[in-house]
Amino acid sequence: YPVAETDHVLLLENERDGIKKYMKKLQEETKMTEENGMENKESDEIGAIVANCNPFTKGHRYLVEYAASRCRYLHLFILSEEQEFISSDARFHMVSEGVKDLKNVILHRTSDYLISPVVFPTYFMKEKDQAFTMNCMLDIEIFRRYIAKNLGITKRFVGSEPNCQVTNEYNRCLKEYLPQSGIEVEEIKRLEIDDMPVSASDVRRAYEGSRMEDVKRWVPETTYQYLSECKK
């Protein structure tokens, strides 16, 4: 069953109306927050962030807090793909604990529809750079056509990425193409601690090397508590 297509890529799924069911779930999650009257009344923007949070760092918290302060509601999508360091469910719980004081933030899982192996199957293609750009366009088409349209999203926030060429290219595609659909993209300079950008990969390396003091400097207390428990 077709989900979305660009000039070069067609995404199919094996479940009829799978994307429609996902949209319904997002709308139900949104309605729960809206009914509680938790909006930021100082803004008319509806924002979105898509993040991995493996783990949830002070850098992620900085980006979410910044975006939430500038939006009526902020939709925060956490990648659903299972990863080696922290499971999808644990990452979602970690983020939920880390942003629970930000009442206008609405948490969602990405399922297979945003930044997933389904949307970025570049290992099937010989021309990796060209393939990645094609997959970016597919990801943007799904976000624009379904998610932004159904949730009324007007702005997408991304963090700057000084060390990763892949993320830089993804951000470039977002900034080039989303405004064509009336969706503003704002890139926020990454939080620095001791003149170094806060990085989830650095947190993972510190954790695996049992450098828990470094971990504590780079993550919120809620994340640190979770990681400390895992060390026991």
Predicted regions and their residues:
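Nucleotidyltransferase catalytic core that binds NTPs
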Residues: 1-232
